[in-house]
Amino acid sequence: MPTILVSALEASSNIHLEELRHNLPKDYRFIGVFESKEALYSPREFSIMGFRDVIGRLGFLLKAHKEMVQLAKQADMVLLMDSSSFNIPLAKKIKKQDPHKKIMYYILPQVWAWKKWRAKSLEKYCDFLGAILPFEVGYYQKKAQYVGHPLLDEIKYYKKDIKGETLVFMPGSRKSEIAKMFPLFVKAAQILEQNEGFKRRVLVVPSFFKGLDLKALYGEDIKLFEISYDAHKSLFEAEFAFICSGTATLEAALIGTPFALAYRAKTMDFLIARMLVNLHYIGLANIFYNALNNETPGLGESQLHPELIQHFLSVEGLLKAYEEMDRERYFKESLRLREYLKHGSARKIAEEMAFLLNLT
């Protein structure tokens, strides 16, 4: 029975992990940080964003780091997913503790956008790097392989045409995101009803919010929406979606649903990020679309969908994006994007894990 230490701090990473586990033998035992009652910590305890938030939780993060390094002694291998600020130092400490411990990094940090030096650190401390973007491999010397994209394993619904019956609203998975995005989405929904007539309004809620008091999280205006915990099905049925920046924007693009990306950070966090990251786009679909068109990812001229960021984000901007988007062009180009990513990644990652464990 192989024991795997997992560090999956993000909601999206846990969705990818669940799909991966379907491709692994049932006797694999998982320990660490992931969505499970048996885990050391729940990913919800790491649900922070912004530089000030990190400083405020530093004591907890250091404690969790120390416990994960100790827990690694029980593991046959280590699987790190995304969350590079936590996981790269973790890989370094585990490798120092046991140089023979096999470490896989799946869902690589965006070294093509900033902190390119992280690529060298990953190759130094990890044994296999699973790239989910075709262009990522070029930033590494030898240990990275393109394994496919996990969303192509997970998405079961793909549009065959641009039609849809609902408007979908996805204000994020963090409380701070919801507090900023949801009031804007509510106002946009109300004005759209005045202008366009009534359309079903669907609020997609993260699955790990099940059982929580949604009114306390979203406020009284949640009563204006139908609630869905199934993002893929809801996007498939939608005419248009308003989405907080994140993995959901790429999900919408692959499904074929027209959408506008919305994002607003704390002013200080945004200014710091702007100094560190030089990108025209923050949406994954736009970044991939640049690469597809042989442009520098995130810095190209081509755009698949509108992005409303920081002071450009307003109710008026959301309405304009809805009204002016060329839906037919978008749908055609979204099919090209799906072809670019080729296939899913879970089976390849499962094979590489077996290889690292000397089970093949």
From Swiss-Prot:
Family membership noted in the UniProt record: Belongs to the LpxB family.
Matching InterPro entries: Glyco_trans_19 (IPR003835)
Record's protein name: Lipid-A-disaccharide synthase
Pathway: Bacterial outer membrane biogenesis; LPS lipid A biosynthesis
Organism of derivation: Helicobacter pylori (strain J99 / ATCC 700824)
Any one GO molecular-function label of the UniProt entry: phospholipid binding
Function noted in UniProt: Condensation of UDP-2,3-diacylglucosamine and 2,3-diacylglucosamine-1-phosphate to form lipid A disaccharide, a precursor of lipid A, a phosphorylated glycolipid that anchors the lipopolysaccharide to the outer membrane of the cell.
Keywords per UniProt: Glycosyltransferase, Lipid A biosynthesis, Lipid biosynthesis, Lipid metabolism, Transferase
One annotated GO biological process: lipid A biosynthetic process
Uppermost EC category: transferase
CC per GO annotation: membrane
UniProt-listed Enzyme Commission number(s): 2.4.1.182
Catalysed reaction equations from the record: a lipid X + a UDP-2-N,3-O-bis[(3R)-3-hydroxyacyl]-alpha-D-glucosamine = a lipid A disaccharide + UDP + H(+)
Top-level taxon: Bacteria
